[in-house]
Regions:
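Bacterial N-terminal signal peptides that target proteins for export
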Residues: 1-11
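Sec/Tat signal peptide C-region and signal peptidase I cleavage site
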Residues: 21-25
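Bacterial N-terminal signal peptides
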Residues: 10-19
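GH16 jelly-roll
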Residues: 26-252
Length: 252
């Protein structure tokens, strides 16, 4: 059986016409970039990059271009259980290293980013999306810095959805580097999915708006205008290399 889960979305990025510290003066917003995905087919290569292969977190899916496409004004990202597994071209017999030790590709999905094409510092980011909520889903809308290894480059998770100990949650997070290599300091809020579905049983069937307001002093993460998490000035000013005062690329 070929199992598919789909995620559809539209992006918009707004920047302040005045000082970034004046985030609440919403009349000063100026749209600097948006993507409405109005042309069916592949994403605009002037803006988006496709990832290829097994990438991170020891996840089961192989990322490939065919699983992300524009249709009817949405970016559609498909996670598939393939009818027929194919060989991992990077497989190395007797290797104990991931992903060289994975012989077959059973699941595929897509991950796209704006690295070196659309990067920004401060402002408002809005993403309208409908996310899959079936078991095994790990949808994400996130931002990373570049030029340093993770987590020293700083990570902002506008949205993550996955199951924690079997219970579905929506998360709004940020992390940054510490004195110990590859060890992150997290500011994370995990909201049980029932917080949303108790108010609207059809929540998962609808599009919703995730928003980030980012200035010199804080990062505020919203879902449908509800504040989920605020990462304050301690993180933005005392984190390694002041990573939240540097440009970020978008990923999904």
């Amino acid at each position: 059986m070929n199992v598919k889960q789909k995620m559809g979305m539209a992006f918009g990025v707004l920047a302040m016409a005045l000082s970034p510290s004046a985030l609440m003066a919403q009349n000063d917003w100026k749209l600097v970039w948006s993507d409405e995905f109005n042309t069916d087919g592949l994403l605009d290569s002037k803006v988006w990059n496709y990832e290829e292969g097994f990438k991170r977190n020891h996840e089961a899916q192989w990322y490939q271009k065919a699983n992300a496409y524009c249709k009817d004004g949405n970016l559609v990202i498909e996670a598939r259980k393939e009818k027929k597994a194919r060989r991992n071209p990077g497989f190395r017999k007797n290797s104990s290293r991931w992903p060289e030790n994975i012989e077959k590709i059973h699941y595929t999905s897509a991950s796209v980013n704006t690295a070196e094409k659309k990067e920004f510092l401060y402002g408002r980011v809005e993403v309208r999306a409908k996310i899959p909520t079936a078991g095994g889903a790990w949808s994400a809308i996130w931002l990373l810095g570049r030029g340093m290894d993770w987590p020293s480059n700083g990570e902002i998770d506008m949205m993550e959805y996955y199951r924690r100990q079997g219970v579905p949650h929506i998360l709004a997070n940020a992390c940054w580097g510490t004195d110990k290599p590859w060890t992150a300091k997290w500011n994370s809020k995990a909201i049980p999915f029932t917080h949303f579905t108790d108010r609207d049983a059809q929540w998962a069937d609808k599009f919703h708006v995730w928003r980030m307001d980012w200035d010199e002093q804080s990062i505020r993460l919203y879902l449908d205008d509800e504040l989920l998490n605020e990462i304050g000035s301690t993180a933005t000013t005392q984190s390694t290399h002041l990573v939240f005062r540097k440009q970020k690329k978008m990923l999904s």
